[in-house]
């Protein structure tokens, strides 16, 4: 009897989990083939993704699964796709943001301080939750920072999926619709890699989803209610608001904006007498809790870090849009890096994949209109979904692409709601089996296209070294140089080098990479000027640069992301030829500069004599 109940509860979930496991094996085989540049790497990888996503989505679309099975399927989908990200680099962190957070966590383990300055990511000093949790787990368990980070983000991914499922279920009243909503949410361009990386946004999304679920529970408590439920829910809302405020700035601001929208729509409906929500508490307490918590944290702790990061992101996006509209600059080449272009089929798929999302939004809005919906939360989520076309427009500019990418995980909450709404209350009739097959195929196309849209072709899978290609520029030579620095150079020595090497030296190497300018001299000039003169020596002295590190491979081709060191360096996004090897090796003959390390590709020069 127990066995039959368990089988009824889990349904097809164990079998689909086994199929997802087979998909992960294909992904791993594809990545291994990609590391050796073998043919068949991409077909194996994409077949693995399809084997994970399509069968689970097909089952979620059907009406035969029970609530428990749907929860299991949602968790299986979310965690299987998380493992896809882990398989991209299963031995260490290699992404830029991840290495910045590794540095922050390592400092927390060594010093016990959560607010140490971080040259790779200054925001870590203002939002220390991820570093604190990971450092605590590492110290208590004896696990490395890498493995502790994987566990923390894996748990966050599970919480995100479960909380969103419960949120959508409570809004629509349908477990079936909620499950489909999660499958649609997985189609946002950030879901597979960006929001699965070891970074504060990955953790914050889980906290935000739990907070919104608690806010929904509070909003539906009647004004006349008293007792432990009211006090407990209020305490939970407050605790989650505080937790979110100290975890991530953009997620906190997005939640503040959403709750303000929800509250405004509720107020309008109540004043018109068009809503029955008057007897419920509504979202006022959650809105005040997150606004006050983030406001205080911003004012007393993280204001500088928030303005530095978000101010730069939004100002660059705004300037890019103005330049595009005024003709000062051309539009960005879609679905490519500065020196990378995707195949025509991939570009076509990425473009076509946005069509089902637009159709879904239109269909969902039509349902809301026909039902004369007067629920303020549903209307607020619909408004969020309407921001999706706006984010697509931002991708026409170089800087706007970053803003669009970061907004997708928030906008897709509204899209997921509309998908859940469309499936809620539906009965399987007529040719629904054929319709399920067709919808699964469309969902798979959308999922694949979103990944093409959100991730550079070069970084979807591992492979041979490429210049200025984020993950693909991290190689054993760079890691060896970082290990040498950690073992033999003074900790936190000031060093100048390219972006990838700076990331490795600043994390695993324990150095302090320096960016920016000295007076009127751009620091990348030290690396890329044809010769070494008074200006370069002055910059080294003024910035107290103890070491300059040169990767000779930079002379092989232009950087894929458009720049070698910083996005505002001279020639950024406009280079058509690589920097000459002679330019990179000019420090060999500079008096007072000595070569102290070389592994054939990466050379470390001691420039401390020039700082005296």
What spans do the regions from the language model cover?
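Active-site lumenal/periplasmic loops and adjacent helix-entry segments of GT-C-fold
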Residues: 61-64, 71, 79-207, 410, ...
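Hydrophobic, aromatic-rich transmembrane alpha-helices
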Residues: 54-58, 263, 291, 347-374
């Amino acid at each position: 009897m127990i066995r039959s109940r368990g089988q009824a509860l889990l349904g097809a979930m164990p079998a689909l989990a086994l199929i997802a496991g087979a998909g992960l094996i294909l992904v791993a085989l594809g990545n291994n083939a990609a590391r050796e540049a073998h043919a068949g790497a991409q077909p194996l990888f994409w077949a693995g993704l399809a084997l994970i996503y399509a069968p689970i989505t097909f089952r979620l679309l059907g009406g035969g699964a029970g609530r428990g099975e749907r929860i299991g399927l949602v968790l299986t989908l979310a965690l299987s796709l998380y493992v896809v990200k882990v398989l991209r680099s299963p031995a260490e962190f290699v992404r830029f943001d991840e290495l910045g957070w590794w540095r922050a966590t390592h400092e927390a383990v060594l010093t016990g301080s959560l607010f140490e300055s971080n040259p790779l990511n200054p925001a870590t000093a203002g939002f220390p939750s991820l570093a604190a949790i990971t450092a605590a787990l590492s110290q208590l368990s004896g696990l490395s920072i890498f493995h502790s980070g994987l566990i923390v983000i894996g748990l966050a991914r599970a919480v995100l999926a479960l909380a969103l499922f419960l949120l959508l279920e409570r809004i629509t009243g349908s477990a079936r619709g909620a499950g489909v909503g999660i499958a649609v949410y997985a189609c946002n361009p950030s879901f597979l890699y960006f929001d699965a990386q070891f970074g504060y946004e990955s953790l914050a999304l889980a906290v935000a989803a739990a907070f919104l679920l608690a806010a929904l529970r509070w909003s539906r408590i009647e004004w006349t209610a008293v007792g432990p439920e009211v006090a407990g829910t209020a305490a939970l809302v407050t605790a989650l608001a505080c937790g979110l405020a100290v975890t991530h700035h953009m997620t906190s601001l997005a939640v503040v904006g959403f709750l303000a929208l929800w509250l405004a729509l509720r107020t309008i409906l109540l004043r018109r007498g068009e809503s029955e929500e008057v007897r419920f508490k509504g979202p006022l307490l959650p809105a005040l809790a997150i606004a006050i918590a983030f406001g205080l944290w911003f004012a007393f702790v993280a204001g500088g870090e928030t303005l530095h990061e978000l101010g730069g992101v939004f100002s660059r996006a705004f300037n890019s849009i103005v330049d595009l509209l005024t003709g000062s600059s051309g539009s960005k080449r879609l679905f490519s890096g500065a020196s990378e272009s995707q195949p025509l089929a991939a570009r076509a798929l990425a473009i076509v994949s946005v069509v089902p999302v637009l159709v879904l939004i239109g269909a969902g809005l039509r349902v809301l209109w026909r039902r004369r919906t007067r629920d303020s939360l549903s209307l607020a989520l619909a408004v969020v979904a309407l921001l999706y076309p706006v984010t697509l427009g931002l991708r026409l500019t170089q800087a706007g692409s970053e803003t669009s990418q970061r907004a997708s995980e928030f906008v897709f909450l509204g899209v997921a709601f509309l998908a859940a709404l469309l499936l809620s209350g539906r009965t399987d009739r007529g040719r629904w089996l054929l319709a399920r097959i067709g919808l699964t195929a469309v969902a798979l196309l959308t999922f694949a296209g979103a990944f093409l849209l959100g991730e550079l072709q070069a970084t979807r899978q591992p492979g041979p070294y490429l210049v200025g290609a984020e993950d693909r520029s991290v190689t054993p030579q760079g890691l060896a140089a970082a290990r040498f620095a950690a073992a033999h150079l003074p900790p936190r020595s000031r060093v100048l080098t390219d972006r990838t090497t700076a990331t490795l030296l600043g994390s695993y190497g324990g150095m302090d990479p320096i960016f920016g300018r000295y007076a009127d001299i751009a620091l990348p000039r030290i690396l890329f000027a044809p010769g070494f003169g008074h200006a370069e020596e002055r910059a080294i002295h003024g910035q107290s640069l103890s070491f300059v590190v040169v990767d000779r491979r930079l002379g092989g081709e232009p950087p894929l992301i458009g720049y070698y060191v910083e996005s505002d360096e001279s020639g950024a996004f406009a280079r058509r030829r690589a920097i000459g090897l002679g330019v990179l090796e000019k420090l060999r003959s500079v008096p007072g500069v000595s070569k102290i390390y070389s592994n054939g590709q990466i050379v470390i020069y001691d420039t401390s004599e020039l700082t005296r």
